Design a protein with these regions (language model features):
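Alpha-helical scaffold domains
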Residues: 1-244
């Protein structure tokens, strides 16, 4: 089979193919995980990843252009676009960042965001440039850009070199959006797993709001890589909040 020539017709054929392979149970599962997302076909991520890998070997730029212009609103379309970008090999880092920047400006789902972040393996070969890009997005008023940055820090920068910076970011970059706060809590739970003593010290003197702080402790306690003793200590560290 030759390379697909992407146009409105071939893109619609892709959507029909996805619908023909829909899993209703998985669709219901995905609906529950993504409040506000009604248009879901029901395709598992490994299958979407296979599609994206095939597309990225061809004219992926044309595919992205056509897919944006002919978007049907399905979450699977967002997943595929993100995974295609994550798979590209034949572009320089600045062009890559342009595509990433455009994509994250359209994100409105935590699952799309987090799957996208995990696919950006090119980050490992461009740590400094991507680090700058991540910090730039933390300045945005868009909470999804901030979540992108937090998850990227967790996926690629969770090391001794960046730990103090991560703590500082969690203390100083604020946003009332639920999915941003939950990303910060998740990041800090992973910090605890890798750097127990320094993260414990951070928890005792941090500047987190009560919700994010308590969620960070909760997510840390839920980890299978945290000892029973530490879970008890963390339980006692929970802040008591007054319900209004």
């Amino acid at each position: 089979m030759g390379e697909v020539i992407w146009n409105k017709e071939t893109y619609n054929e892709l959507i029909v193919n996805l619908k023909n392979n829909a899993d209703e149970k998985y669709r219901d599962f995905t609906l529950n995980l993504n409040p506000g997302k009604e248009k879901i076909i029901g395709i598992r991520i490994p299958e979407l990843r296979k599609k994206a890998t095939e597309i990225s070997k061809g004219d992926w730029r044309k595919f992205l252009d056509i897919s944006y212009k002919n978007d049907n609103g399905y979450i699977e379309e967002e997943f595929i676009r993100g995974l295609v970008i994550g798979n590209v090999k034949n572009c320089d880092i600045e062009e890559f960042i342009d595509y990433v920047d455009d994509f994250i400006g359209r994100i409105d789902s935590w699952s799309v965001n987090d799957t996208f972040c995990s696919s950006l393996k090119i980050t490992k070969k461009n740590m400094d440039r991507m680090h700058t890009f991540i910090l730039d997005n933390l300045k945005s008023k868009n909470p999804w850009r901030k979540r992108f940055s937090i998850v990227m820090l967790m996926d690629y920068y969770l090391s001794e070199e960046y730990l103090d910076e991560i703590f500082d970011i969690c203390d100083t970059i604020k946003d009332d959006e639920y999915y941003y706060k939950m990303a910060v809590a998740w990041l800090l739970s992973m910090c605890f797993v890798k750097f127990r003593d320094r993260t414990m010290a951070y928890f005792t003197s941090c500047n987190l709001d009560d919700f994010t702080y308590n969620k960070a402790l909760q997510k840390t306690r839920e980890s299978l890589r945290v000892s029973k003793e530490d879970k008890e200590i963390l339980k006692e560290m929970k802040r008591k909040t007054v319900k209004m």
